[in-house]
């Protein structure tokens, strides 16, 4: 039986491939595919954001090779960065509560 971390990794891989390759290259997310992924899979995160051009900024920041698409490595960097930010927020909330 897979561990929770193994299931989380499997979920990330499956989500990436569910959205990638519909518009262009099979193993990359176009800007439109990434936008759809973010809207459907990170609903809470996006609802708290005030920046209207957030998806464009995310693509620009993630697109290390400047091909205007996001590959799996670039996608994982985004998920990791968001996870770190969420953890930082969680730790700050615990500190405020004195735990």
From Swiss-Prot:
What name does this protein carry?
Answer: Protein S100-Z
Its keywords, alphabetically, are: Calcium, Metal-binding, Repeat
Q: Which Pfam families match?
A: S_100 (PF01023)
| Gene giving rise to this polypeptide | S100Z
Tissue expression: Highest level of expression in spleen and leukocytes.
Q: Which domain of life is it from?
A: Eukaryota
InterPro entries from the UniProt entry: EF-hand-dom_pair, EF_Hand_1_Ca_BS, EF_hand_dom, S100/CaBP7/8-like_CS, S100_Ca-bd_sub
Single GO MF descriptor: calcium-dependent protein binding
Tell me the residue numbers annotated for binding Ca(2+) 1: 20, 23, 28, 33
Quaternary structure (record): Homodimer. Interacts with S100P.
């Amino acid at each position: 039986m897979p561990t929770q971390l193994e299931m989380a990794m499997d979920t990330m891989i499956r989500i990436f491939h569910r959205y990638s390759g519909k518009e262009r290259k099979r193993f990359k997310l176009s800007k439109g595919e990434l936008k759809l992924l973010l809207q459907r899979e990170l609903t809470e995160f996006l609802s708290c954001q005030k920046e209207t051009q957030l998806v464009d900024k995310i693509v620009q920041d993630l697109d290390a090779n400047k091909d205007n698409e996001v590959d799996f490595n670039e996608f994982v960097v985004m998920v990791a960065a968001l996870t770190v930010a969420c953890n930082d927020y969680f730790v700050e909330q615990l500190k405020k509560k004195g735990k």
